[in-house]
């Protein structure tokens, strides 16, 4: 389960990064259905269109989306985006429900090796997870206007199944003053999971990461903290293939006992983006944000208020048979910590947090991808909120906490990925920390340096 700035033990844990490949899995699920029922493919015009597309129609290399992949997602994982090209079979005039004809089930398997530059106290280095994740997906078109992407994941880290990223959509098209308006409704469980770009947190690079390596303590709320902890319903529109807008309202799941950091009432999320082609160059520029009041403990009394405001951009350019993309994300978070400071868990009543991510990806012949990125999280110094961890005599020293009460962390990531087939990915990623929880050296007063958390992560990722 994800946690966010719950300071009962004086530590903070960044949520494990979920992996994702929504349209590839819809594609592979449909392809499996086609192979199993090839003789009836022509009787299923909408699914025949889905299964007739190569995975490269939706993805540069999975899980990155092409322009068609973005349109397919905004059209609710249905074939509305290509309906004009579909010739309906005369025998297929029943009401538009296709879930009884095919069962769009897919499987994702990941196994990984993680090695840090310095072993974590009390553990062996070079940990292997088999599996790291095992996911089942129900992903595809239910009716001509309704589609689903539902992921249930088994985590090797905690040995349990949970409902992972889920997005159920209704979508349709209309015309306003001769301009196309795509509109829809989304029901999902993770702010930004509904977004079609890779410059927002849910689908940003890295697409998979180590869940057994140390990560910085501080994370913005919109940056995956509420993932799978909330349910939201919202509406979106895409006007003239340029302007995208989305408003979704989230509410915490009713769990007994309640989770720490439960949302009081509802938490509104908003998104606005503009996309434009300049010759062969593509550019998206946007903004998104989230406001939430959270109970840090019991569901009563004062709350903490979080305001997240973010800006993002995505750039793409084909280079012959190759492809280049780049992403930039900036998130500002304002924190009014009335409840936390009142309970003595924060030195300040008001803190801020700034997050920046910049990455570039080069795809060679859809078989090899090179990734490089820079990341930074800087914020207010708060000796109680980010302070040094408690050290228990006779126990290994923790790797969390900050000796100077600073959340500042920054560094670089590099990755190489090889795709021998469209549904198989082998990759190796290396993370370098130049600063971790406020310092480069002895960051939590236990003698551990930021460089000790540098991480090699080797992954095998299979989809079927």
Model-flagged regions — what are they?
Residues 52-63:
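The canonical Cys-X-X-Cys-His
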Residues 54, 424, 450-464:
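Outer-membrane beta-barrel "beta-signal"
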Residues 121-123, 153-155, 218-221, 255-258, ...:
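Extracellular loop and loop/strand-boundary signature of outer-membrane beta-barrel proteins
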